A protein has these predicted regions:
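Intrinsically disordered, low-complexity polar/charged tails and linkers
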Residues: 1-6
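Mobile "lid/hinge" segments at catalytic clefts and subdomain interfaces of large enzymes
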Residues: 122-210
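Small-residue-enriched alpha-helical segments and adjacent helix-cap loops
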Residues: 8, 13-157, 189
Length: 210
């Protein structure tokens, strides 16, 4: 699962989930994904609500080839599934939102890269979801994420309002406000601390309560 692979009910095939950090792709990456879908599947892509792309009906024996093809354009499947930090999502208008105090994309990218393959979050009790919102409109939907960051500027310092503990599982919950303002250079240390607590003290017996 941590390699972005889910089994399907149909025998001998599986679903591949591709991470699209903060919902941004280059034209080369999109072309590569399309070519891989044509070659290894049925030429159809499923775009998810959390800015991933899924390819269904991939032959089990050809999966390593597919991984290698995607890697040629730095497209990753790693930790797109399983009890890891899932795809870091962001407002779809990040970078050109007229209401944004700044572009959240570089911060989402830095957080994504820091926690990808990070040993502190490889065997958690449950998956962990993070989002970035460009403005108070909260188009990144921070209130339904484990951690949500909403762009803010205070005294000419870039930072974020931080939301924690949201979810849409079997027991849906609106996130709480953890910080009204946290400087941008503190978001990675904050998330690392939250992950360590979640990993050590989080529910592991009942997935519905995790």
């Amino acid at each position: 699962l941590a390699r972005g692979v889910y089994g399907q009910r149909q025998q001998g095939v599986q679903m591949i989930r591709i991470k699209i950090p903060y919902g941004k792709l280059s034209s080369h990456q999109l072309r590569r994904i399309s070519e891989v879908s044509d070659e290894y599947s049925r030429g159809r892509l499923h775009i998810t609500t959390r800015q991933d792309i899924q390819i269904h009906y991939v032959d089990l024996n050809r999966t390593p080839e597919l991984w290698a093809e995607l890697e040629r354009d730095e497209v990753t499947l790693r930790e797109a599934c399983g009890n890891t930090v899932r795809n870091v999502t962001a407002s779809e208008t990040a970078g050109f939102d007229v209401d944004e105090p700044f572009d959240v994309s570089p911060y989402a990218d830095a957080l994504f890269k820091f926690f990808l393959r990070n040993p502190i979050c490889q065997e958690m009790g449950r998956k962990f979801k993070v989002s970035f919102s460009s403005s108070d409109s909260d188009t990144g939907l921070s209130y339904i994420h484990d951690l949500g960051f909403i762009a803010k500027i205070e005294n000419n310092v870039r930072g974020f309002k931080v939301m924690i503990g949201g979810g849409l599982g079997s027991q849906p919950r609106h996130a709480d406000t953890l910080y009204n303002f946290l400087p941008s250079d503190k978001i990675i240390p904050l998330m690392e601390g939250v992950l360590r607590v979640f990993d050590r003290h989080g529910e592991r017996k009942s997935r519905s309560k995790a």
